């Protein structure tokens, strides 16, 4: 795909698609609940459609019409042993959270995914689930897909996670809904808390004490209505575009502002971006608002520690942002980037260097020196099949002089099928 380059301005208003994390969880909890769940502003991206497909194979009646999904909950003991393998596609969230749910089911299931999923570590989830009593086998001792799982009666678990990962935490908590007793997860830093908020929305009970989250099982959930706010991880690409493309002003409507996810706003503010948030309100369990960003003069910052879990998915676009900030930006404590859809430390550095960025990889992040003009004399960049790399490169092309072609542009459909159309609407 040929990308727009040397863009003179980006102006307009868009509504980014529904939050991917919340869309996944809404389907999963709706499937476990008794009664009907209606999901509005659902993200119909490839990852979330994989979640729907898996739960249909587990016997759940799910109807989708665009961004509206109706789930007829199976209720306690209502999931059925699948006749076919459960294919999670490219979705790590589907894989890990589904394992937590399957751990509590008295039947056998096989879980597979695409080439990218086959490289992503599952041991961080299979290990604690085995401690709870699930029988899980797979490649390299159950650390990689394909995985075979036979669930059943689970023991409660008090688990200290070595990583701040919402997927690990959520898998254990979901399994804990089926265990007889209190299951808890303690994290080194606070990860996104959508699971905790949504279990409560579905009538469940969750206790949060500092960095420890616990559920007392077994629990019964009830169907509900949920509006999925705009995904701040998708909004991040346009927030950065608005800050670095000349003469720009972009407003993003109805964006989720969950404080465990707003690290990108903190970084933009620290860098000196002209950014404003209006119309803040609560939509069921999540804060939502409208964000406006304008072209800004930016300064370098250091990013690490507790901030990393709040912006881990935004680091590729933050790296681009840093190329346009005066000084040296350091991103550290971000080793989790190595086990995303790609090794994002490597892919970000490789692709931005093609465009002339002064960027280098470190063991747990990267260093970016700015402000650096980007150029593209017939350059070909590659998403590496990673949706966030593809969208970052499309924004990078906007400030590059010359011509840029993006390979594997279809990857963006994982989380933002209309991304290129929305970008064109701002030109």
UniProtKB/Swiss-Prot annotation:
Coiled-coil regions listed in the entry: none
Molecular function per GO: 3-phosphoshikimate 1-carboxyvinyltransferase activity
The UniProt record lists the keyword Amino-acid biosynthesis: yes
GO cellular component: cytoplasm
EC number(s) given by UniProt: 2.5.1.19
Keywords tagged on the record: Amino-acid biosynthesis, Aromatic amino acid biosynthesis, Cytoplasm, Transferase
Described purpose of this protein according to its UniProt entry: Catalyzes the transfer of the enolpyruvyl moiety of phosphoenolpyruvate (PEP) to the 5-hydroxyl of shikimate-3-phosphate (S3P) to produce enolpyruvyl shikimate-3-phosphate and inorganic phosphate.
PANTHER family per record: AROM/DEHYDROQUINATE SYNTHASE (PTHR21090), PENTAFUNCTIONAL AROM POLYPEPTIDE (PTHR21090:SF5)
Subunit text: Monomer.
Protein name: 3-phosphoshikimate 1-carboxyvinyltransferase
């Amino acid at each position: 795909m040929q990308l727009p380059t040397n863009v003179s301005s980006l102006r307009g208003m868009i509504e980014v698609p529904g939050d991917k994390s919340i869309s996944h969880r809404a389907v999963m909890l709706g499937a476990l609940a008794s009664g009907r769940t209606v999901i509005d502003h659902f993200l119909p991206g490839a990852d979330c459609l994989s979640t729907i497909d898996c739960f249909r194979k587990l016997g759940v009646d799910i109807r989708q019409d665009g961004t509206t999904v109706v789930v007829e909950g199976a209720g306690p003991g209502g999931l059925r042993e699948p006749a076919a393998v459960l294919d999670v596609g490219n979705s790590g969230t589907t894989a890990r959270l589904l394992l937590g749910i399957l751990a509590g089911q008295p039947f056998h299931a096989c879980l597979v995914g695409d080439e990218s999923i086959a490289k992503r570590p599952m041991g961080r989830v299979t290990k604690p689930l085995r401690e709870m009593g699930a029988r899980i086998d797979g490649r390299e001792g159950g650390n990689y897909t394909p995985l075979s799982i036979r669930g059943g009666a689970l023991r409660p678990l008090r688990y200290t996670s070595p990583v701040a990962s919402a997927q690990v935490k959520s898998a254990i908590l979901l399994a804990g809904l089926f265990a007889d007793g209190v299951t808890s997860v303690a994290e080194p830093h606070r990860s996104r808390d959508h699971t905790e908020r949504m279990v409560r929305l579905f009538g469940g009970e969750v206790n949060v004490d500092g960095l420890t989250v616990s559920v007392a099982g077994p629990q019964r959930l009830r169907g509900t209505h949920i509006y999925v706010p705009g995904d701040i991880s998708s909004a991040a690409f346009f927030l950065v575009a608005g800050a670095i493309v000349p003469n720009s002003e972009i407003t993003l409507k109805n964006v989720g502002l969950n404080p465990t996810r707003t690290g990108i706003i903190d970084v933009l503010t620290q860098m000196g971006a002209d950014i404003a948030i209006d119309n803040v309100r609560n939509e069921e369990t999540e804060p939502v608002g409208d964000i406006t960003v304008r072209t800004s003069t930016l300064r370098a910052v250091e990013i690490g520690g507790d901030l990393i879990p709040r912006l881990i998915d935004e680091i590729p676009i933050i790296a681009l942002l840093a190329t346009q900030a005066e000084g040296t930006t350091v991103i550290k404590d971000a080793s989790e980037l190595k086990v995303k859809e790609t090794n994002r430390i490597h892919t970000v550095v490789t692709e931005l260097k093609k465009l002339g960025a002064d960027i280098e990889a470190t063991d747990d992040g990267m260093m970016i020196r700015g402000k650096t003009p980007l150029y593209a004399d017939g350059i070909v960049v590659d998403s590496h099949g990673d949706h966030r790399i593809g969208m970052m490169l499309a924004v990078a092309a906007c400030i590059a002089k010359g011509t840029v072609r993006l390979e594997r542009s279809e990857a963006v459909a994982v989380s933002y099928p209309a991304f290129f159309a929305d970008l064109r609407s701002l030109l």
